[in-house]
């Protein structure tokens, strides 16, 4: 990556990385000790896939990263969870680090990301908001300094408790998934009554209270975030004894959507897919 090789595809990312490496603002290293000891803030940005068998988020990589960071802390450091994690993970990360390094001077903050694949650079430069969950003014000041370049865009910076920040991410994704699921069910109704779902969505979206984003009927939501995040939120709610019937319905409706769409495709092709390219 230091020489310009980017392991993922994101439009414009290679140029941004190359320019900042050349300017000396960005560097890459595999030396954990050197990186952590020089840092005022260390971000944990690792995968949190759905755990096989029970639907909960797998936090193995998060806790391993916390242990690796703990081994190399030197001076006051803010450890920031950037990964999408269930409520209470920040407290667990703090416990992991404290157990490994009782003498360490650190805070744990939650700073969820809201980037969209394909427009991540623009979303980072002009975010709707920056959410930071932490409990100390010292940590808040470090996070303010990190995001100060965005202040010229008047980006709202919301400071909350850790648990609130963690839940904001899950609740946001669940709400967007709900909009997608809602318009899909309206699309099914449109087919029955002879209405055009595109016109219905357009008429709904012009209401500023609703907005037009995520009102596009289709095969349901997918990708790397919405399915695992809605399921993780549902599992967290169930574990806490909280009722989230809307989220449960969204997950169930979306799961049923894909086979239903497959049946519609088959019907449109005369009921037989053998030998056909879809």
Annotate the PLM regions.
Residues 1-278:
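Structural/interface elements that position substrates and couple domains in central-metabolism enzymes
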């Amino acid at each position: 990556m230091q020489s310009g090789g980017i392991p993922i595809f994101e439009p414009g990312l290679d140029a941004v990385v190359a320019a900042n490496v050349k300017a000396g603002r960005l560097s890459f290293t595999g030396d954990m000790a050197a990186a952590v000891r020089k840092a005022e803030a260390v971000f944990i940005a690792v995968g949190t896939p759905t755990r096989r068998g029970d639907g909960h988020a797998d936090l193995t990589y998060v806790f391993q990263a916390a242990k690796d960071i703990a081994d190399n802390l030197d001076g006051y450091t803010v450890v920031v969870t950037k990964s999408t994690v269930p409520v209470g993970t920040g407290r667990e990360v703090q416990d992991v680090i404290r157990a490994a390094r009782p003498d360490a001077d650190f805070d744990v903050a939650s700073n969820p990301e809201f980037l969209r694949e394909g427009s991540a650079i623009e979303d980072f430069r002009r975010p709707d908001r920056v959410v930071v969950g932490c409990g100390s003014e010292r940590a808040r000041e470090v996070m303010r300094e990190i995001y100060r370049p965005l202040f010229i865009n008047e980006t709202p910076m919301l400071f909350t408790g850790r648990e609130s920040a963690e839940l904001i991410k899950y609740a946001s994704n669940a709400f967007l998934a709900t909009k997608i699921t809602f318009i899909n069910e309206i699309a099914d109704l449109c087919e029955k009554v002879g209405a055009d779902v595109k016109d219905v969505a357009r008429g709904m979206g012009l209401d500023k209270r609703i907005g037009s984003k995520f009102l596009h009927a289709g095969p349901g939501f997918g990708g790397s975030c919405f399915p695992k995040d809605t399921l993780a939120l549902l599992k967290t709610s169930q574990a806490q004894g909280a009722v989230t019937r809307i989220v449960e319905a969204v997950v169930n409706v979306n799961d049923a959507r894909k086979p239903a769409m497959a049946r519609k495709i088959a019907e449109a092709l005369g009921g037989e897919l053998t030998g056909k390219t879809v």
